[in-house]
Amino acid sequence: MGLNINRPRRGSLAFSPRKRAKRPVPRIRSWPEEDTVRLQAFPVYKAGMSHAFIKEDNPKSPNAGQEVFTPITILEAPPINVCAIRVYGRNERNYLTTLTEVWADNLDKELERKIKLPKKEDRKTVEDLEALKDKIEDVRVLVHTNPKLTCLPKKKPEILEIRIGGKDIEERLNYAKEILGKQLNITDVFQEGELVDTIGVTKGKGFQGQVKRWGVKIQFGKHARKGVGRHVGSIGPWQPKMVMWSVPMPGQMGYHQRTEYNKRILKIGNNGDEITPKGGFLHYGVIRNNYVVLKGSVQGPAKRLIVLRRAIRPQEPLIKVPEITYISTTSKQGK
C-alpha cells in the first residue's frame, strides 16, 4: 500500500470566473430579515487605516478588561438623499419584479449627471401605491450619495437600492413615504457596537500569472534551469483534447465584488479633525463629514465606495459601545 498524500488543488474555484466587476458600485443580492422598520444599508467612502487601543469587552477573551492594539479602518459617511420608492411584487413565475417607482419632487440637480430623470408629468405619486398595496411583496428605496461634500474630485453621485426592513408591508410603506426626499445620516441607520457586513469591489491587480493568481507551486530543478518554473506543469491529458475550465490559468486578478462579514462598528463621529492623521489620509485627504470606524480591514483602495449592510448572519448581538482609549493620528506620509 503506497503513501497516501493529501494535496488539495491550488486556489479556490468558488469565485470563478475571476473577471472584473461590472461597476465599482456593489450590487446587494441578499438582505437580512428583521422586525425593526429601518434602512438595512448605508454607503460610505473608504478613507484609510490606522490603529487604536481598545479595552477588550469580551468576557471569554483571555485579554478581557485589558487594552488591546487593534487595526482600524476609517470610512467617511456623508449624508444620503432618498430620491425614490421602489416596490416589488411577484410575476407569473413567482419571481420578484418591479411594480412601480415613486420619485421625490425635490431632486438634487447633480443627479442629472448620472441618469435621465423622469418627467414630472410622467412620475407616479404616493397615492398610486395604495392601489398596489395588496400586490406588494417588498419595499425598497433608491438613494444617491453626495461626493461633492467630501474631498473626492467628483460631483457625480452614485445611485443604489436599499431595502427597508420589517415584517409589516404597510409600516414599511409608511416609513418609505416619511423619508422620501429627505437626507439621512449614518446615525439614522447604525449605532456604535453593531455588527455590519462590508460589500465592495476589491483592489485591481491587473493581468497576473498562475503563481500569483492561483498560488501554484513554483517548479524547481530542470524546470527552473529552463526558465519555466512559474507555470502549471500539465494543463490536461491527451484525451479528451481540451483544457478544463478548472485549470489554473493567467488572467484578471482583483477588482472583484466581495462581501466581508461581521465587522464591528467601534465609533461613529461627526468631527473629522479628531480622526484625520497629520497631512491627511494617503490618496484621500481629510474627513469633512460624519465618519465610521470599523475594527479590522475593509476591501478596496482609498476612495472606493463601500456599502455597510446590517449583518446577515451575526455571530452574537454585540451592542456594547466599545471603550477606545487611543486612536493614532500620526502622519501616514512616512516622515
Curated annotation (Swiss-Prot):
Annotated keywords: Ribonucleoprotein, Ribosomal protein, RNA-binding, rRNA-binding
A cellular component term from Gene Ontology for this protein is: cytosolic large ribosomal subunit
The disulfide bonds in this chain are none
Database matches in Pfam families: Ribosomal_L3
Molecular function as annotated in GO: RNA binding; rRNA binding; structural constituent of ribosome
- Specify the superkingdom: Archaea
Instruction: Check the record and name the NCBIfam families matching this protein.
Output: L3_arch, PRK04231.1
Q: What does this protein do?
A: One of the primary rRNA binding proteins, it binds directly near the 3'-end of the 23S rRNA, where it nucleates assembly of the 50S subunit.
Please identify the protein, giving its name as recorded: Large ribosomal subunit protein uL3
